[in-house]
Structure formats: structure tokens, C-alpha cells
A protein has these predicted regions:
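N-terminal cap/lid segment of alpha/beta-hydrolase-fold proteins
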Residues: 10-57
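Structural cue for short, hydrophobic secondary-structure segments
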Residues: 65-68, 95, 127
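Short beta-strand immediately N-terminal to the catalytic nucleophile in serine-hydrolase-like folds
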Residues: 126-128, 151
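Glycine-rich nucleophile elbow surrounding the catalytic serine of serine-hydrolase chemistry
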Residues: 128-138
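Hydrolase active-site cap/lid region
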Residues: 138-170
């Protein structure tokens, strides 16, 4: 059983390698028209910035969306358009970027997301895709977190020990 092949998601999606470019275009178009504060610093490293999108009127709270990418790829700029749904329902949306493995441990990324959440208006709803789903699930017990919705999270990390990617994950 080739574990690297099992975790190569894009290879099994028709035209999957083109998706990131499409996501980036959609996200950039959304940012161009959104009521937002972009690249708000929450920590000392260059990647510790977040985009904060504001709804019309007083927000009901904040949805925090954490991007995926197996802890080694992507940043907030690919996902801005996903803020549209919560914004339409009166929620602020915060999307943090974070340092990537192998420069940091996964536990440090979790701490960075926790730091990004400090000072956000609650109640907080956390969501994230893939590795982002894993990260928000780790934060489910934090104060002021009312709901957590991991989307297709990497929930069992044990199989990753058998991948080449494991050399970068710490």
C-alpha cells in the first residue's frame, strides 16, 4: 500500500492541479469588493497575518476559517471567497495564515491559531478544511469557542508517519 499515493488528493480529482489557481482568483475577486481589513498582524513572523471580513451592521460573532494544505502549503489568500456565506448571515469572518512545517511544529501552528483568536468578538465559531479542520478541532475546548466545524479534517495522523511528507511534519 503506497501511503504517499493515498494522500495525493489532487491526483484523483479531474483537473485537480488547476484548483489552487482557481481558488486564488475567486478569493482575490472577493477581497476586491469585500468590507475587510487585510493582513492584520497577530504575531511576529511574516506569515502571522489575518484577513478580517465585516458584515453589514453589528456582527453576531466571529467565524474563524483555518486553511488546509497538510500544514505545508497555502495561506489565507486562497480562501477569502468562503467568507461570503457567514457574512451574508451577519457574522464577521477571520482568516489567519500561519507558519508552515517544516519551519515549525504542528503544535506551534495550533498556538498561532490560538493567538490569532485573541481579542476576536465572540461568540466564536471555528471551521477549517483538511489540516485546518485538524487545527480547529484541537482548539474546541478554548474559552469563547461556541462551535467547531472541521471540514474533511485530517483526523488520524498515524498514516502520515508512513509518507514522505512525514519528514516535513513535526
Amino acid at each position: 500500500m503506497d501511503m504517499d499515493d493515498r494522500f495525493a488528493n489532487a491526483a484523483y480529482i479531474p483537473d485537480g492541479m488547476s484548483y489552487p489557481e482557481k481558488w486564488a482568483r475567486q478569493a482575490a475577486a472577493f477581497r476586491a469588493t469585500a468590507k475587510a481589513e487585510l493582513d492584520v498582524r497577530y504575531g511576529p513572523s511574516a506569515r502571522q497575518v489575518m484577513d478580517v471580513f465585516h458584515p453589514e451592521g453589528t456582527p453576531k460573532g466571529t467565524v474563524v476559517f483555518v486553511h488546509g494544505g497538510y500544514w505545508v502549503a497555502f495561506d489565507k489568500s486562497f480562501w477569502s471567497h468562503l467568507a461570503a456565506g457567514p457574512l451574508a448571515h451577519g457574522w464577521s469572518v477571520t482568516m489567519p495564515s500561519y507558519d508552515l512545517c517544516p519551519d515549525v511544529h504542528i503544535s506551534e501552528i495550533t498556538q498561532q491559531i490560538e493567538e490569532a483568536m485573541r481579542g476576536l468578538q465572540g461568540p466564536l465559531r471555528l471551521t477549517g478544511h483538511s489540516a485546518g479542520g485538524h487545527l480547529v478541532a484541537r482548539l474546541a475546548g478554548m474559552p469563547h469557542v461556541a462551535r467547531v466545524v472541521p471540514i474533511s479534517p485530517v483526523a488520524d495522523l498515524t498514516p502520515l508517519l508512513q509518507t514522505q511528507m512525514n519528514a516535513d511534519l513535526r
